[in-house]
C-alpha cells in the first residue's frame, strides 16, 4: 500500500513539473515569436517587400489571436501543488536541509530523543496546517469564488494545502516510526543519481541496503550478533 502511495506521489509531482515546464516553454516561445514576426513586418515594409510584409502580418495576426494569458495563472497553481506535495516527498526521502551540529554532539539516547521530538513537532505543525487548510477550503467552497483567468473554483486551487499538509504529516509520522524501530533516517545523497553507479554502494556485508543519515550515526543502530 505504501509503495502505491509513494509511486502516486512521484507520478503526481513529475506530471506537475512536466506540465508547468511545457506551459512556460510554449508561453515564452509564443511571446518572443510574436515580437520577431512584428519586427519582420516592419523590415519588409521598410524595404518595399509588400508580399513578404503581408505574409508576415498574416502570421502576426494568427499568433496574436492565440490567447495564452491563462498560462501564467495555471503555472502558479501547478507550482503551489508541486511545492506542497514536493515537501512531503522531501520528508520521505530526506531531501530537506537539517542543521545537525548540536544534535551530533549529544550522546546516543539524547540524540534519539531530540530527533523524535523534531519529527513529532513537524507532524504536529503540518497536522495543524492541514486542519486549518481544510476549514479554509470549506469556506472558499461556500464563497463560490473563482480564479481571474481560468475561472477555476478557488476551493479547488487551495485544496493543495490540506492535501499536501496531510501527506506531509503522515510522512513525518512514517519517518518517526521507522527511526524509532530501526534507528535510521532516510538520507538523500545530492551527488547520487538513481540508477547510476549504484553497484556495491550503501550495501553492508550481509547485502542489506544502508540508509544512514548524518543524524543517525552507526552507534545508534545495533546489529544483531551471530550466535
Curated annotation (Swiss-Prot):
PANTHER family given in the database record: 2,3-DIKETO-L-GULONATE TRAP TRANSPORTER SMALL PERMEASE PROTEIN YIAM
Q: Which residues lie on this side of the membrane: Periplasmic?
A: 29-67, 134-149
Regions crossing the membrane: 8-28, 68-88, 113-133, 150-170
Any Gene Ontology biological process: C4-dicarboxylate transport
Give the family this protein belongs to, as stated in its UniProt record.
Belongs to the TRAP transporter small permease family.
Protein name (record) = C4-dicarboxylate TRAP transporter small permease protein DctQ
Q: Which UniProt key words apply to this protein?
A: Cell inner membrane, Cell membrane, Membrane, Transmembrane, Transmembrane helix, Transport
Annotated source species: Rhodobacter capsulatus (Rhodopseudomonas capsulata)
Cytoplasmic topological intervals: 1-7, 89-112, 171-227
Q: Name one GO cellular component term.
A: plasma membrane
Q: Does the keyword Cell inner membrane apply?
A: yes
Q: Please report the record's description of how this protein sits within the membrane.
A: Multi-pass membrane protein
| Domain of life the protein comes from | Bacteria
The record's function comment reads: Part of the tripartite ATP-independent periplasmic (TRAP) transport system DctPQM involved in C4-dicarboxylates uptake.
Q: How does it assemble?
A: The complex comprises the extracytoplasmic solute receptor protein DctP, and the two transmembrane proteins DctQ and DctM.
Q: Which gene encodes it?
A: dctQ
Q: What happens when the gene is disrupted?
A: Deletion mutant is unable to transport succinate, and does not grow on D-malate, L-malate, succinate or fumarate as the sole carbon source under aerobic conditions in the dark.
Give its localization.
Cell inner membrane
Provide a Gene Ontology MF annotation, just one: transmembrane transporter activity
